[in-house]
Amino acid sequence: MSVETTTRIMNGYFEALFSGADFSAFFTEDVSWTTTETGDHVSGREAVRNLIIKLHTETFNAHPELRRSGIADGYAFVEADFVGTHTGQFADIPPTGAAIRVPYCVTYDVVDDGIRALRGYMPMLLIRQQLEQASAPAS
C-alpha cells in the first residue's frame, strides 16, 4: 500500500461523499464502522453507507466543516465539526429542530481495493446534551 494509492482512494471517497455521488464504491465489501464512544459497530458496504446517509440526512440535516485531514500509507483521518439541524429520532429524543455543532474525527484504514474500516470518534453524549438543552422548557 502506498501513500499515492491511499491518497487516490481517499480523494475519490471525499469527492463522492461531498458531491452526493456513490461514496460506498470506495468501500471494501467487508468494510466496518465503529462508533468509538458507544462501541456500536456495523459491517458491510451497504450498512456503513446507510449509517452515514442516515446520520447526515435523516437524523440530522447536517454537513461536516473540515478542520484538518491527513493521509499516510494505508491510513487517513479527518477532523471536522458536525453542523446541522436535528430532524429525526436520535436515541430516545424525537426531532427538536435544534441546531447542533460538535467536533468529531474519523479514522480510515485503507487497503488496495478501498476503505476497510472507519472509526468515528463522535461525541454522542455532547450531541445528546445539546439536544436536551435545546428542548428544555425556558425558565
Predicted regions and their residues:
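C-terminal and inter-domain tail/linker signature
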Residues: 1-139
